[in-house]
UniProtKB/Swiss-Prot annotation:
Domain of life: Bacteria
Induction: Constitutively expressed (at protein level).
Gene name per UniProt: yohO
Organism: Escherichia coli (strain K12)
Localization per Swiss-Prot or TrEMBL: Cell inner membrane
Name of the featured protein: UPF0387 membrane protein YohO
Family: Belongs to the UPF0387 family.
Length: 35
């Protein structure tokens, strides 16, 4: 049960980091195009 809980937390953390990275990448691309 603990392993499953850790796995879920790790999955959500990975998704959060991926989402933030995607937003940063999109913003960086937008800045390059705007500039």
């Amino acid at each position: 049960m603990r392993i499953a809980k850790i796995g879920v937390i790790a999955l959500f953390l990975f998704m959060a980091l991926g989402g933030i990275g995607g937003v940063m990448l999109a913003g960086y691309t937008f800045i390059l195009r705007a500039g």
